[in-house]
Structures are given as structure tokens and as C-alpha cells.
Design a protein with these regions (language model features):
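N-terminal Rossmann-like NAD(P)+-binding domain of SDR-like oxidoreductases, especially those catalyzing
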Residues: 1-133
Length: 133
């Protein structure tokens, strides 16, 4: 089991989604200091709500396309580890809203990478991507 006794600071984008919610729960239970940045949960009820993830992490509701809001949350968190899960993953939606999908999946990733580039605290970055880029 992952042991984060040193209270590693972790920043997760997409923390209100299915995978992000489970990851938050796992990392918080392992002792990490988790900050999540994401849109509101995509469904209701959602795993995020049912598992009461908000009680385990600092939850920031925001859009990764909004660099200034993302940067503010990122700077406040001062993470050592960044896990980027935020994406628009629905194929049908990508056909209906190609610009939104591009802005979220490509430019949102550019925004989080820019936050990492400008920071002095990040030691590790993981990009979990989708084939909808």
C-alpha cells in the first residue's frame, strides 16, 4: 500500500470524475494532502458525492481552460506531485463540440503544464490522457 506519511502535497485535475474520485480517496487514505481542481461532478448522484470525497480533500471547482483560476489554485496548493486527469472524454460530445473538446483536452493540458513549468515545488507529473485529443 502507498505510504505518504510525510503528507506529500498532491494536486489532481479531474478529481470529481469517476477515476479522479477513487484516486483522491486512495491518496487521502494513504496520508497525502490532496487538492483537487475540476468542474462540478458530471452526474448526480456521483461517486464524488456518494463517497463524500470533499471531506477528504481540498476541492476547488474550476475549469482547466481558465489559466488564471487554475494557477491560483495551483499556487495555493504548492504540490510536489501533479496528476492530470481532467478531460472531455465522451466521443459523441467531441463530435458535437470539437472546439470545446480541443480547448479542454489540449489547451487545458498546456495550462497545467505551464503551472508546473512556473513552479519550484513539483517533483513529479503524471498526465492521464484520452484519445480525444
Amino acid at each position: 500500500m502507498l505510504d505518504l506519511k510525510k503528507k506529500k502535497k498532491v494536486f489532481i485535475t479531474g478529481h470529481t470524475g469517476f477515476k479522479g474520485s477513487w484516486l483522491c480517496k486512495l491518496l487521502a487514505n494513504a496520508g497525502a494532502d490532496v487538492t483537487g481542481y475540476s468542474l462540478n461532478p458530471p452526474t448526480s448522484p456521483s461517486l464524488f458525492e456518494i463517497a463524500n470525497i470533499e471531506s477528504d480533500v481540498k476541492s476547488v471547482i474550476g475549469d482547466i481552460r481558465d489559466f488564471d483560476s487554475l494557477k491560483k489554485a495551483f499556487d495555493e496548493a504548492q504540490p510536489e506531485i501533479v496528476l492530470h486527469l481532467a478531460a472531455q472524454p465522451i466521443v459523441r460530445d467531441s463530435y458535437k463540440m470539437p472546439a470545446y473538446t480541443y480547448e479542454t483536452n489540449v489547451m487545458g493540458t498546456v495550462n497545467i503544464l505551464e503551472c508546473v513549468r512556473q513552479s519550484n515545488c513539483v517533483k513529479s507529473f503524471l498526465n492521464v490522457t484520452t484519445d480525444k485529443v
